Amino acid sequence: VKAKNKFLLAPLTNMQSPDQGRISDDEFIWLTKRAEGGFGIIMTCAMPVLKSGIGWKGQLGIYDPKHEDGHYRLNERLHNLEALSIAQIFHAGIRADINYSGDKIGPSMNSEKSAREMSIAEIEQMKVAFVECAIRAYQCKYDGIELHAAHGYLIGQFLSKKFNKREDDYGGSFKNRAKFLIDIIEEIKEKTSSNFLIGCLLYTS
């Protein structure tokens, strides 16, 4: 996979798709205009893998089949403009909007954010949600996905010693704290193709 140039539109939060996560005309135009202007790679804003992972109102979604038509349409236009397309996916975790999540969850209990600790079963279900959304992105003709593991969202919460106090296979050592992320990446690799790009946004603090 090769981009036509090094100009990349970063995943910017626009809050332009308030219709239950369906891509709006405003967001469609905003993204495609950048490709019309010559950007070689277009990235979406962070899209939740479950409704419970929504971080703010107006967020573009990819967690439901009803979102697919909009993503097909977006990718058709971007590819006609010779731009690569990347879907950024995430779950807000303890930073989720309570109006959508109803029940905030994270790797460990967080009283400040009124979040409870995820069970092993919930962790497994969450990994499935990430993989299913990556597959949906692949089927909707995105050239790749980026896992958002920064800015204090769920994957980053698992990586962080501050937020991850677990004493099981998902906590403690860095290897254990990274297991959630690594498992997701490996499963996506198995269920897409070698040409499907898999990236990860990380930060060091």
Pin down the residues of each PLM region:
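Aromatic- and acidic-residue-enriched carbohydrate-binding clefts of CAZyme catalytic domains
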Residues: 50, 62, 97-118, 157-175
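Non-globular sequence segments
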Residues: 76, 80, 84, 90-142
